[in-house]
């Protein structure tokens, strides 16, 4: 199944999209305000969803109900994950702290040699 998505991209999002998928440049239309309009089809909402969420402040979703629903689900899931403290477990916190300490120790040794 293919999903039709319409996005309004700021300069950063447009540049990153063209770098990763150059063929999309042919589908982009420059708007009067300098942003870009893109209408395309995707085989999965996961990739475009990750792109939109990663650059949410530089992308507007336009007339794409399936993508909007997917994004709302991912945002809700992330909010629940954060509110339940699932994002970093105590064990993970300890591992992160150990890694930071080991990195600092290695940097100190390198600085002293």
Regions found by a protein language model. Name each.
Residues 1-113:
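Polybasic (Lys/Arg-rich)
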